[in-house]
Swiss-Prot record:
Annotated protein name in UniProt: Photosystem II reaction center protein M
Native source organism of the sequence: Thermosynechococcus vestitus (strain NIES-2133 / IAM M-273 / BP-1)
Complex formation: PSII is composed of 1 copy each of membrane proteins PsbA, PsbB, PsbC, PsbD, PsbE, PsbF, PsbH, PsbI, PsbJ, PsbK, PsbL, PsbM, PsbT, PsbX, PsbY, PsbZ, Psb30/Ycf12, peripheral proteins PsbO, CyanoQ (PsbQ), PsbU, PsbV and a large number of cofactors. It forms dimeric complexes. Part of a photosystem II (PSII) assembly intermediate complex PSII-I; crystallized from a strain deleted of psbJ, it forms monomeric PSII before addition of the oxygen evolving complex. PSII-I includes 3 assembly factors not found in mature PSII (Psb27, Psb28 and Psb34).
GO CC terms in record: photosystem II; plasma membrane-derived thylakoid membrane
Membrane topology: Single-pass membrane protein
Sequence ranges on the Lumenal membrane side: 1-6
Disruption phenotype: Decreased yields of PSII dimers with increased PSII monomers, slightly slower photoautotrophic growth, about 20% less oxygen evolution. Formed PSII dimers are less stable than wild-type.
N-terminal signal peptide: none
Length: 36
C-alpha cells in the first residue's frame, strides 16, 4: 500500500490544528480562572 504523502500531511494537519486550538483555549481559560 503506497502512502500518499500529501494525504498524510493533510490528515496530520486535520488532527493537529483542532487539537492545538483546543489546547490554547484551555490554557487561556485556566489562566483567566487563576487570575480572577
Amino acid at each position: 500500500m503506497e502512502v500518499n504523502q500529501l494525504g498524510l500531511i493533510a490528515t496530520a494537519l486535520f488532527v493537529l490544528v483542532p487539537s492545538v486550538f483546543l489546547i490554547i483555549l484551555y490554557v487561556q481559560t485556566e489562566s483567566q480562572q487563576k487570575s480572577s
